[in-house]
């Protein structure tokens, strides 16, 4: 991408994000009014956009996670305390996506996601309608299985950042989903993240795998990591293989670890959500 084109794309990044969720600005305003009073308060501020994420099967085990972390999201407004496995199994990079000639640029290049398996007592999983640039469908979530944490990433060694959480990216709780009705129709896309030297053509499976909800995280110490953008979720689809770098380093509030990257897993698209039944 030329400098002038990139500059234009970045100027219109917020518009691209709205297009990415169906071009429904009114729906964005409405969705932000749901949830707890804390979540509603976020709408008084301009929420940063949410990038597409290209996620990889990964392994990294040098993290220390305290017990007693409480997660709050729109499915579980009273929160729940999961058991969090201190091993990263999914690593996500912000990715530039080009679909049908429209470029969705990266707006927060330093903010990645490191995802940890979770287990918990049974949580509410209401049926939802999820809409993005690939279409709209009614989805039935299963129990949450991942906590994705904003993380710094380095290709050469421990990032050594302070604070250890990059700004302007939500935590996410992810739920496996099945399609009840409707369908997504993703075209062939071009993807470029930090692992690729140029845009790569990729095929996206039209059946989504996971829905990731913006999540407030509360540490046992009382420290709160609030929801930054309550409206935009991530809906993740299996995607064909793209270039990888075999080892990176992730850093977040749980520590720093080398991460082994094994294969491309998902393309996660910014999406809006409406609850249709509990």
Where are these regions (language model features)?
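C-terminal region of N-terminal signal peptides and the immediate post-cleavage residues
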Residues: 21-46
């Amino acid at each position: 991408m030329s400098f002038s084109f990139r500059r234009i794309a970045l100027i219109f990044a917020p518009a691209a994000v709205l297009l990415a969720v169906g071009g429904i600005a009114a729906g964005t305003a409405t969705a932000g009014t749901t949830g707890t009073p804390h979540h509603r308060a976020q709408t008084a501020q301009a929420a940063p956009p949410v990038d597409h994420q290209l996620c990889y099967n990964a392994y990294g085990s040098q993290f220390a996670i305290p017990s007693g972390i409480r997660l709050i999201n729109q499915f579980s407004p009273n929160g729940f305390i999961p058991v969090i496995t201190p091993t990263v199994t999914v690593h996500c990079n912000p990715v530039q996506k080009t679909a049908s000639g429209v470029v969705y640029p990266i707006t927060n290049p330093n903010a990645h996601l490191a995802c940890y398996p979770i287990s918990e007592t049974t949580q509410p999983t209401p049926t939802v309608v999820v809409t993005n640039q690939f279409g709209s469908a009614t989805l039935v979530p299963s129990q949450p299985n991942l906590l994705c944490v904003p993380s710094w990433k380095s290709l050469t060694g421990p990032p050594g950042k302070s604070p250890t959480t990059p700004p302007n990216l939500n935590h996410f709780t992810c739920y496996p989903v099945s399609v009840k009705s409707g369908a997504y129709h993703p075209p062939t896309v071009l993807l470029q993240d930090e692992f690729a030297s140029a845009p790569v053509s990729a095929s996206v499976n039209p059946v989504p795998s996971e829905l990731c909800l913006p999540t407030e995280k509360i540490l046992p110490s009382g420290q709160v990591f609030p929801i930054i953008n309550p409206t935009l979720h991530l809906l993740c689809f299996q995607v064909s293989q793209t270039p990888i770098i075999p080892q990176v380093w992730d850093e977040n509030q749980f520590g720093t670890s080398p991460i082994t990257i094994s294969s491309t897993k998902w393309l996660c698209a910014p999406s809006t959500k409406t609850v249709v039944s509990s």
